[in-house]
Each structure stands twice: as structure tokens, then as C-alpha cells.
UniProtKB/Swiss-Prot annotation:
<feature type="region of interest" description="Regulatory domain">
    <location>
        <begin position="396"/>
        <end position="520"/>
    </location>
</feature>
<dbReference type="GO" id="GO:0003852">
    <property type="term" value="F:2-isopropylmalate synthase activity"/>
</dbReference>
<feature type="binding site">
    <location>
        <position position="211"/>
    </location>
    <ligand>
        <name>Mn(2+)</name>
    </ligand>
</feature>
<dbReference type="InterPro" id="IPR054691">
    <property type="entry name" value="LeuA/HCS_post-cat"/>
</dbReference>
<comment type="function">
    <text>Catalyzes the condensation of the acetyl group of acetyl-CoA with 3-methyl-2-oxobutanoate (2-ketoisovalerate) to form 3-carboxy-3-hydroxy-4-methylpentanoate (2-isopropylmalate).</text>
</comment>
<dbReference type="Pfam" id="PF00682">
    <property type="entry name" value="HMGL-like"/>
</dbReference>
<feature type="binding site">
    <location>
        <position position="245"/>
    </location>
    <ligand>
        <name>Mn(2+)</name>
    </ligand>
</feature>
<keyword id="KW-0464">Manganese</keyword>
<dbReference type="InterPro" id="IPR002034">
    <property type="entry name" value="AIPM/Hcit_synth_CS"/>
</dbReference>
<keyword id="KW-0963">Cytoplasm</keyword>
<dbReference type="InterPro" id="IPR000891">
    <property type="entry name" value="PYR_CT"/>
</dbReference>
<dbReference type="InterPro" id="IPR036230">
    <property type="entry name" value="LeuA_allosteric_dom_sf"/>
</dbReference>
<keyword id="KW-0808">Transferase</keyword>
<keyword id="KW-0432">Leucine biosynthesis</keyword>
<protein>
    <recommendedName>
        <fullName>2-isopropylmalate synthase</fullName>
        <ecNumber>2.3.3.13</ecNumber>
    </recommendedName>
</protein>
<dbReference type="GO" id="GO:0009098">
    <property type="term" value="P:L-leucine biosynthetic process"/>
</dbReference>
<comment type="similarity">
    <text>Belongs to the alpha-IPM synthase/homocitrate synthase family. LeuA type 1 subfamily.</text>
</comment>
Length: 520
């Protein structure tokens, strides 16, 4: 499907409230300096309006707003204010450094809030809206009014509140689904009817601010756009009060991917989405779940064999957007118990192995057996499987025993030779590895001069394995080999045998020795 939109496509304004509503999420508070760092990222992301804070609530918020105002000159910087004169005056003062300031005033309108929170009548609410929007407009030309709990407000009264706010000078009307109560059909109809019927609606921007209590924040925001909203309020990673807000990464990519359907776009620089998401995760210490849309670790990961096979044929079979479009480097083929042979073979090719049919079959059988022991198979695991497959033509490690003999070590190794016979040898050395390599040299008849030897861990947690890497010389020629095992001494033996077996195969085939590197 064609997801592109023309240059004449209408544009939605993205109002990011990560630094205000998002920060209200428990555990997500930020210092003024952290807010400035996040605001810079939102600016680079292309956000149109950044809600910077609630100045009347704290000195910290006032400081953060002033810092952002001095530095960020492109986006509109908004601050939240209750319908109180002192709040509005404080907010206006906090915005004095901003190049493009916006005062965002709000008042509850639903019967539940009027009765139990405000203790105000309809008439008192209307009077307060008129008075405080007028006051705000006296300070700043760009004024947004939010009818808190709009989706639980009687629609006739909501229409009257909207009319009064527009008449008083509001330039944006926000109709929030404050508690995530509404449904897409309801909010689409609400926006459509109010925009069609309220006097002056054609002179302002209508905005949606949807919470995620029922998991519908993005769906409701999209429906509001269908109903005529031209601003969406959202947060990075969907953080916010309770279950959070409409997620910026989800709403913007929905509009981009389904551009032919919505025929509306945003100015978001989508390749910066993932880095912005990860920055927020670091700042507030709240990681997103792996299956989070767009920015989760599994968003572009495929393990199912059927899905992997389709992806190898054409990525569009199981991906509706490119990972590069949102800032991921590429899709991930996660190798695990659900993976098929095609994905394993493709990954082996990427690691540099060109296998015959029988070799692929053997490695895949070993791969499936390994999947019964651990959840994910890494590249190092595949390399270890390749080692097992390739050494079958040469010596194989049957057993080994390492023991201390005073200040020295003793190694006993038992190998299976290419004909299947058992060969056992012992050797002493200055340490377990020195003794081990001496015993292997005696058993195989191959003499190797060790240049370097390294060990490190590969994999994660209980699935971690030890990898041994060595560089050796034989007849003046350098060789490299690796071995992987749960036991690091065994990994060292496998690395040594990797080189020895290749040397023996070269000797049998009459291959002239030269520098070679093995990944096994």
C-alpha cells in the first residue's frame, strides 16, 4: 500500500506534554537541567509545541521553563495554568524568555467535577472561563483552553464552554479525555459536532488530549483527528498520569504509515524517535516493555520460523514500517525454538559460513537441541555449533581432567581421532592452559607456538558461555581459532583443536599453509 502523502497534505500539530503531564507519572520527575536536555531532544524531533511545566506548582518548574525559553527558539513553549489570576500571572512571567510562548489554562467542566471538585454551577464555570481566558490573552496572544474531563461533560454545556472560550480569545480549544473513558466512535462524533456547530470554531485549532486508562489513547486520538482535531497532545513512550497518555511515537507513525487513509501528516523527524525514547528512559529510569509498539526491543524482532522465512523473502510480509524510519538500525532475526532452517542458514551466511546441504542439516539439528536448553541462540552459540560440525573430520574432545601437581598443573585429555579411535595423553605445564595445550599437542602430533590467548563471556545471564580466542604459529605461519563452551577450559581446548584440525585437513589435501582466521 502507498503510504506517502503529498506536499499539500494537511498537517497535525504535535503538542508534547512529556515535561508536564508525563512528568506527573509516579517516579518520573526531572530536574530543571534534565528537562532542558529532554526539551532539546524534543526540539530536534520536530515537536511543534512543548508543554514545559506548571510554573505555579514549584520554583523548579519556573526555573526549567525560563531555561528552555532562553535556549529553544523554534518550537512554541507552553505552560499550564489553572483558572486562577495568580497562576496566570506566574505562568506569564515564567514565559518571558520564550520566543513563542503559549498560556494553557484549564477548568473542569463535567458534572462530577463541578459538584465534587469545584463546587461550581454551570454559570460560574462559564464566567470563570471567560474571565481567565481574557486575562491570559492580555498577557500572551497564543492561549489554549482545556475543558478538563470534556468527554464526561454534557455536550450542550461543552459547546457553550467552547463558545465562551473562543469569544474570550482562546486560539486553541482542547477537549481532553482526562480519565481515558471515551471510545473512538464517541470522541469522533463529539469533535465533529462541536466543530460544525460552535460559533467561531473555524477560527481556532481543536486539540485532543487522550489518556490510556482503557488502552485507547492512540485510537481515540486518531478518531479525534477524523472528527476534525488538528492538534494532538501526547508524550514520549506514553508516560503520564495513571496508565499514561497517547504515545507520540505511536500516533505519529500511525499517521505516517496510514497516510493514504488519514491524509494528514506531522512534522516529526521520525528517525529520531528511538533515540528520544531511549533518552527519556535513561532520564527517568523507566524502561519501556519489550513489546511496546515502535520503540520496544521486540518491535522489529522476529523469531517465528514462518515469519522469519517471509521476512527473508520480502520484509513487507511482516513489517508495515522500516526500522530505519524510526531510528532502529535494522530488523532483528531472533534465533530461538520457533526459528526455522532458513533463518539459521541466513544467519550463518552473514557470519561467513558457506555450507553444503548436509552441513546445514547437521547444524540445524544441533541448533534445535540447543534451543531446548536456552531461550535465545546468539552468534557465539552458532559459531560454537559450527565448530562442532567442522571438527567431525578431525579430532574431537571426549574428556579432560586438570589437576594441580605442586606448583604446576597436570592435564589428561582423551580425544576421538578421525577414524573414531580413542587417544589419551597427559602433560604438565606452568598452569592449566599450558598443561592442556601440551597434552593436546602430544595427542594430535601437531605442534603450535602460542602467540596470544584471551577468554571472555558471551551471552546473557544463565545462558552465558565462555569464549576462548587464540593466535598461534605453525612453521612460521599465523593461525587463529576460537572455541565456545560453558566451561572456559573446555572452550580453550576446542579453540586449540579448531586450529589443529584445519592444519591436518590442509596437510591431507596438500594445501599450502598461509595465514588463516577461523571463527568456530
Amino acid at each position: 500500500m502507498n503510504t506517502t502523502v503529498s506536499n499539500q497534505t494537511p498537517r497535525i500539530r504535535i503538542f508534547d506534554t512529556t515535561l508536564r503531564d508525563g512528568e506527573q507519572s509516579p517516579g518520573c520527575s526531572m530536574t530543571p537541567q534534565q528537562k532542558l536536555v529532554m526539551a532539546r531532544a524534543l526540539d530536534e524531533l520536530g515537536v511543534d509545541i512543548i508543554e514545559t511545566g506548571f510554573p505555579a506548582s514549584s520554583h523548579s518548574d519556573r526555573e526549567a521553563v525560563a531555561m528552555m525559553g532562553r535556549e529553544l527558539r523554534r518550537p512554541t513553549l507552553a505552560v499550564l495554568s489553572r483558572c486562577l489570576q495568580a497562576d496566570i500571572e506566574t505562568s506569564a512571567k515564567a514565559l518571558e524568555t520564550a520566543a513563542n510562548p503559549r498560556l494553557h489554562v484549564f477548568l473542569s467542566t463535567s458534572p462530577l467535577h463541578r459538584e465534587h471538585k469545584l463546587r461550581m454551577s454551570r454559570e460560574q464555570v462559564l464566567e470563570s472561563v471567560h474571565r481567565h481566558v481574557t486575562l491570559a490573552r492580555g498577557y500572551i496572544d497564543d492561549v489554549e483552553f482545556s475543558a478538563e474531563d470534556a468527554t464526561r461533560t454534557e455536550e450542550d454545556f461543552l459547546a457553550e464552554v467552547t463558545r465562551v472560550a473562543i469569544a474570550a480569545g482562546a486560539t486553541t480549544i482542547n477537549l481532553p479525555d482526562t480519565v481515558g473513558f471515551t471510545t473512538p466512535e464517541e470522541i469522533r462524533g463529539m469533535f465533529s459536532r462541536l466543530i460544525a456547530s460552535v460559533e467561531g470554531a473555524d477560527k481556532v485549532i481543536f486539540s485532543a488530549h487522550c489518556h490510556n486508562d482503557l488502552g485507547l489513547a492512540v485510537a481515540n486520538s486518531l478518531a479525534a483527528i477524523e472528527g476534525g482535531a488538528r492538534q494532538v497532545e501526547c508524550t514520549i513512550n506514553g508516560i503520564g498520569e495513571r496508565a499514561g497518555n497517547c504515545a507520540l511515537e505511536e500516533i505519529t507513525m500511525a499517521l505516517k504509515v496510514r497516510g493514504a487513509f488519514y491524509n494528514i501528516d506531522s512534522a516529526i523527524n521520525t528517525p529520531r524517535i528511538v533515540s528520544t525514547s531511549q533518552l527519556l528512559q535513561r532520564l527517568v529510569g523507566m524502561p519501556v516493555q519489550r513489546n511496546k509498539a515502535v520503540v520496544g526491543g521486540n518491535a522489529f524482532a522476529h523469531e517465528s520460523g514462518i515469519h522469519q522465512h517471509g521476512m527473508l523473502r520480502h520484509r513487507g510480509t511482516y513489517e508495515i514500517m522500516r526500522p530505519e524510519d524510526v531510528g532502529w538500525e535494522s530488523s532483528q532475526m531472533v534465533l530461538g525454538r520457533h526459528s526455522g532452517r532458513a533463518a539459521v542458514e541466513q544467519r550463518l551466511r552473514a557470519l561467513g559460513y558457506l555450507l553444503e546441504e548436509e552441513e546445514v542439516k547437521l547444524v540445524f539439528e544441533q541448533f534445535k537441541a540447543l534451543c531446548e536448553k536456552q531461550r535465545v541462540v546468539t552468534d557465539a552459540d552458532l559459531q560454537a555449533l559450527m565448530q562442532d560440525a567442522t571438527v567431525q573430520e578431525g579430532y574431537r574432545l571426549a574428556s579432560m581432567t586438570i589437576s594441580d601437581v605442586g606448583s604446576r598443573a597436570n592435564a589428561l585429555v582423551e580425544l576421538s581421532d578421525p577414524e573414531g579411535n580413542r587417544v589419551a595423553e597427559t602433560a604438565q605445564g606452568n598452569g592449566p592452559v599450558d598443561a592442556l595445550f601440551g597434552a593436546l599437542a602430544s595427542a594430535t602430533g601437531v605442534k603450535l607456538e602460542l602467540d596470544s590467548y584471551q577468554v571472555h563471556s558471551v551471552g546473557i545471564g544463565a545462558d552465558a558461555r565462555g569464549e576462548a580466542s587464540l593466535s598461534v604459529r605453525h612453521d612460521g605461519v599465523e593461525y587463529e581459532g576460537t572455541g565456545t563452551s560453558k566451561d572456559i577450559i573446555e572452550a580453550s581446548a576446542l579453540a586449540w583443536l579448531d586450529v589443529a584440525n584445519r592444519l591436518l585437513r590442509q596437510r591431507e589435501r596438500g594445501v599450502v599453509a598461509g595465514k588463516t582466521a577461523a571463527v568456530a
